[in-house]
Amino acid sequence: MKIATCCLGKKTKKFFVCILISIAIACGFLVFNAARLKSRQIDVQAIVQSDIDQTVALSHLSNAVQIPTVSYTNRVKNDGSVFLEFQELLETSYPSVTAHLKRYTGEDFGDAQNPSLLYEWSADRSEEIPAILLMAHYDVVAIEQTSLEEWQHPPFSGAIENGFLWGRGTLDNKGAVIALMEACERLVKAGFKPRRDIYVSLGHDEEVGGKYGNQQIASWMRSKGIRLDMALDEGGGIYRGVPGLAQPAALVGIAEKGYVNITMRVQLNQTETGHASIPPRETAIGILSSAVTQLQQTPFPTRLDGGVSRMLDYLGPEMSFFNRIAIGNKQIFGSIIENQFSSTPAGNAALRTTLVPTMIESGFAENALPSTAAANLHLRIQPGETVESALRFLRSTIQDDRITLHIDQTLDGKPRDQLGYREPSRISSDTSASFEGLHRTIKQVFPNVAVAPFFVVASTDSAHYDDPTLTKNVYRFTPWNLDQTGVTLIHGVNEKIATTQFIQMIRFYEQLIINLAGNT
């Protein structure tokens, strides 16, 4: 009996030793993978802060904000005089740019009603180097009239108070327009000669899709045989408060989601309708409501292999040790990472194609059962997926022949005035010379940030240049530094920009032009 007990004890001891060895090996594997995460941040010296006449620069932005360049989907509603006034403001505010850069207008693009602008800064060398395109837009979204009393300063005041410049467009996107023009003006005055052609595009209808602005400019560029190494538009930025990261994150968009508006319609026979006092088991509204609920309860699958994975490859090495263990072992902890991201609206949008019902229409009387009901579904589609794959997912989820899906109809069954969808963009390189130039510039001007690529969830005018025959790489980044409160000001009440941030934006564009087009 003692022998048996002794043998059993030895076996138990050996078993636990094996368990401990296995745990040690597993821990070593996790730690090894975490240790393999090497920083991808470029080590550069911060630039010497150049002298900028802040009073003049801020007055230019204030004047720009005071011009209410609101764009509408139906461009007949646009006030052409304010767009012309804005163009004249640029011409008088930046005399060196006006004198030395060639300016193209709507007439050059074949549409005299197009108030978008394109500046060409010709290279000082004869060698063929692909050009770069720097983009911003000067149209803004309308002000909700019921919100006017909530504004601390009138939305088109351009007021400067307590370190902020207030007004619609300060963040989206007149701040970038004026910062870009200030940078060009300073460089022209200093005698800077670019070694490659530089184009500056200032759109007038980005907020409504860019159909008459940058879409026409991009077509004109193709017709002229212009080739772009890089296009840079809005989309990313510098954000504070990224979970697990002690420093701000400078997120550069290397792709953007597509979108589609889908009309989901239920059409019943007249025999299935009638008086509300004798309702059938199912109604058009009930069927539609059930389908909407089913879609919301069955979200598109998450994809960690997309923009989130690339972002973590850059940010992971800058995080704490335990975060590095999770990120360095994504094949093991992928589901945990996905759950953490999808717990917030922004993180959820980064991980998957999203769907949200935005409009619903049915009924014609309080006591009558309608034969039809329709809802608009707005989808933002992940790069790597398509509009067609999204439609297949919806059909497989609903599985109801009484429900039809249309991308070419509005809720009332009429044809859409404009294209109801845009496919996701290509994924641009995060190892190209142009991305490296962006990365380097960000670190020179904002030395305490961690740079990372990501996928933009919104749509930008850069989509019109997302054509490999025209543009090699498309990036999306605006050099503002925002926390979550600042992000909510975009298109919101009390939109404003810190005056110090605006001055840093000028320095960023100036240094970017030097890095990408300076003589080396």
PLM features: residue spans?
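Acidic/His- and Gly-rich active-site-bordering loop/insert found
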Residues: 25-168, 189-195, 377
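N-terminal Lys/Arg-rich, disordered targeting/topogenic segments
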Residues: 1-10
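Metal-dependent amide/peptide-bond hydrolase catalytic core
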Residues: 13-20, 25-54, 59, 237-248, ...
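Solvent-exposed loop/turn segments at secondary-structure junctions
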Residues: 71-72, 125, 138-141, 205-209, ...
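Short, solvent-exposed loop/turn and secondary-structure capping segments
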Residues: 75-76, 143-148, 210-214, 242-244, ...
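Loop/turn elements at helix/coil->beta-strand transitions in domains of secreted/extracellular proteins
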Residues: 99, 128-131, 194-198, 226-229, ...
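Acidic/histidine-rich catalytic neighborhood of metal-dependent amide-processing enzymes
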Residues: 164-252
